[in-house]
Amino acid sequence: MLTGRESLVRLIGRRRRSPLPAALALAVPPSRSLQDDAADAEREAAAGGSSSGGGDAAGAAGWVACPVCGESIRGTDYCVNTHLDICLTRGTKRKLTQSTLLDFSFSRKATDDYALNNLNTSDEAEHMEPTDGNVSSDGAFFSLNNDKVNSKGSANASSPGCLHGSPDISETCDTCLPPNVLLPYTENTANNGVVKKCLSHMPSTDATSSTIGLLSVTDSSNSVVVDTVIVGRRFHENIELQEGASITLLRDPQNAKDPDAIKVLYAGYECEQMLGYLPRELAKVLAPLLDRHYIECEGCVVGVPEQQLDHVPIQLKCQKYTDENETYDDLKHPQFLWENFICAVGNGNLLQPSSTRYQTNFSSMITDVMANHSHLFSDKEKSFLDSFQLLPDDGQRLFVRIYTRKGPWFRMSSISYREISDLGQAAMELKLAGYIDMISCMDDLSNYDLKEVIDVLSVPEMKEILKELQKNNVSCTRRHELLSTLLYLYRNGTCTILPKRILKWTGTCIRTSDVADELLWRVQRLFFLNGDQDLSFFLLVDLGLVRFPVYACTISHRVFQEISDLLQYEEAIQVAQVMDQSLDNSNMEMVTRCIELSENRLSTAPKEENATRAEPPPSFFSRFSASSVYSKILTLGVSVYERDRRYTDAIRVLKRLLSTVASDRKRGYWALRLSVDLEHMNRSNESLSIAEAGVIDPWVRAGSKIALQRRVVRLSKPPRRWKVPSYANAVTTNIKEVNIEGRPLNCETGAKNVFYGYDGELCGVEQLALQYYADEGGGWRGTHSEGGIWMTIFGLLMWDAIFSDVPDVFQTKFQTAPLDLETDEFYRSRKDLIESQLKKIQDGIAEEILISSWELHQGTSCRGVNWDRHSLTDLRAAVVCTGGHRLASLLRHLALDYRSWSSGMPDLLLWRFLDERGGGEAKLVEVKGPRDQLSEQQRAWILVLMDFGFDVEVCKVSPVSKRR
């Protein structure tokens, strides 16, 4: 992969269906705006009025009866066709009961009442799923169990239109919304009125109420009855369920996924017959009471689900223990836990069906962003996003489902979610609200990318279309060939009826609208602040598969202080996406245009970013600037130019980067590549000058600095330079080498080195070296982890410093490291705390700190910490045998510059104990196979480790000599 490509892909994250930036836009169709949608709706209404089958119905006012289900529907062709598609796919007559958009009052439906009614209906209880979060169940993965979306769409999205050439989103948001959706959210007084109106319809959450969601209080002071479910049945499906059978609870504090786990067992059996677990959210508030023996729980199975692995409805009675001898002070803590339990169960979200948890997560993401970043949205954009909360549940769920899919188009006939009661009604409401686009056989596809629509078709359907078009001479059978053939027939003008034929086969299709896609991309980026994370992380947390650390979010500066900062950042990411897509498609003309545009933007960025501000943001916020993105694009561009041997262009870009980006860890890489490319152009004197300047640059560190120093030593021989550099001896230091031989499986150039190990099994060079050191090399034990084990040790020993309360470094609840970890600010902001910890390590108590940190945080996500790969036993051995002084020096080095030194460490960490009292020694080994050489980063690490007093060597593995 080209240098810089992986970093750019991570930055982009989910590709947007966005138009090209103005400077990159070619002759592409104009983007579809909200006004276009409104105009289409008017044309449909007019067409429906003129062609209505009833004859008397006029436009949108005409109503007809559906011949399938008998429901009254609007008499327009569009509405009739859409409704018939949905009815026919059901296969049975079914009366629609959900209100239409015009009847909807836009007050939030009581979640508690909804959950209560569903769980109290025996026919529907089996279709409900819990909040899940269960330690042992993946049944709540809605993408695995509940959905049946059959779309063959690709992830590639076209880029119709021009971002700056099309109407602004904020100017068009209101045209797609029904009048009763646009509430006056722009003013505080009006907004408060809306909130009060919505809250007036919500049920009471008072813990003393006789009915609180799923909680039935039989005696508010002593006992409660809770209707809940058993999750995790897939692990215990061999246990037969019996309706009415008594059950009991058993704590499982040793559970690796969830220390609050509670098992559900059959009561009264001699041997434990485990049925599953309680949902995670319920177990979280119930576990403290059970651990302290404050309550006693018993219950029964109230129903047996139709599907073997579905969640099992149960009823629990939780009884408080009472002791007349206990004093008031003794009862305060238990009473607090009891009240916390009552309030938590009374909250409707606690026992919310897992199939709708994604809906709540999506809504909470929008709410959080609007609360903390509202200054980055116009009033009309806010109204558009706020209207999502006013949509009925079916509409919200359908939108979240398709938004999290690749798509972009989905057939209505292929969508089936059991938590959505009326798919057709939900789609119509979303279309009227402007959240989705909908196409059917009556629509014109000229405003859409035909390729995206064709992607919905299967291969047999494409072949049938070609037959209908009498193109029997086409012999292609592969999907991409059929797709190209259909597009060719349409674009050359020989088959103008192709769009109608395609829609005849696809039926009604939906996708997220451009406006919704743009705004929600912004919402998601502001919520997670990166491209690596998305809505799936909510689900991973709910399931207990990922646990994030506990830290304080102390925010004193906004990441984007002004909307112009965000818009520039968004445009830069758009350019990065176009660059990435163009490389995929080998469109070198567009790649070159992206590089040139980034050069121009970068040259003007400092003037804009250095504008005087009352409180400048922290330096580690620079990653969220447009110039940071453009520098990544240009870094990748240099790799592209060098690959094509366009050294003149590469030199120009590198000089631009070095002259405009003053503080970036990539300066070392840029200086090195510039020096190398100048030498390719036979400009050795200039190459030497660049290398000499790079050596004294404070931002040039680690491997890049060593590489530049070695270049200076090589190029500065007389007569260019008569004086020997002061670092000449350091960079030419001899590194201890050990040579071993092995029997190779193959000797092919470029193939991975595979050898026969000491035990006769095939292995790599690292495993062969481990076997050598364990046997002939001196009885060492060890692990092949490169820097992984050291990063894990750093995270565990420095946990408190990493997650200490420092302003602005924690902006979201989904972070595994502070924002300043890879900057110089990390050490400066925590110097006292870090040095205090290093003093303890140097004094020899690193092992105690390691054990304590492991027990407190096991399983919690932290940058660099790998819980599965490294056992506590190996970590303890590494810490003890390394020694406090050397370990403290290594950890300080990482704390000072984590980014530069988090890679390139030796392959093997070896240790051996010298006596029973725990004394030991450690060795680090870099293993090299035939034809392998040390990288500059590896050389830099070895020199640093030698300075710290580590025993370091290079083990070279070579094939057995043929003379033997």
Curated annotation (Swiss-Prot):
CDD domains associated with the record: FAN1-like
GO cellular component: nucleus
Domain of life (superkingdom): Eukaryota
Gene3D superfamilies: 3.30.70.2330, 3.40.1350.10, Classic Zinc Finger (3.30.160.60)
Residue numbers spanned by region Disordered: 31-56
Keywords assigned by UniProt, alphabetized: DNA damage, DNA repair, Hydrolase, Magnesium, Manganese, Metal-binding, Nuclease, Zinc, Zinc-finger
Binding site for Mn(2+) 1: 907, 926-927
Reaction catalyzed: Hydrolytically removes 5'-nucleotides successively from the 3'-hydroxy termini of 3'-hydroxy-terminated oligonucleotides
Domain VRR-NUC: 844-958
A GO molecular-function annotation: 5'-flap endonuclease activity
EC number, UniProt record: 3.1.4.1
Zinc finger (UBZ4-type) stretch: 63-92
The protein's required cofactors: Mn(2+); Mg(2+)
Binding site for Zn(2+): 66, 69, 83, 87
A biological process term (GO) from this entry: homologous chromosome pairing at meiosis
Pfam families: FAN1_HTH (PF21315), FAN1_TPR (PF21170), HIRAN (PF08797), VRR_NUC (PF08774)
Residues where Mn(2+) 2 binds: 786, 907
Cofactor binding, per record: Binds 2 magnesium or manganese ions per subunit.
InterPro entries linked to this entry: Fan1-like, FAN1-like_euk, FAN1-like_TPR, FAN1-like_WH, HIRAN, Rad18_UBZ4, tRNA_endonuc-like_dom_sf, VRR_NUC
Enzyme's top EC category: hydrolase
Record's function text: Nuclease required for the repair of DNA interstrand cross-links (ICL). Acts as a 5'-3' exonuclease that anchors at a cut end of DNA and cleaves DNA successively at every third nucleotide, allowing to excise an ICL from one strand through flanking incisions.
The family this protein is said to belong to: Belongs to the FAN1 family.
Name of the protein in its database record: Fanconi-associated nuclease 1 homolog
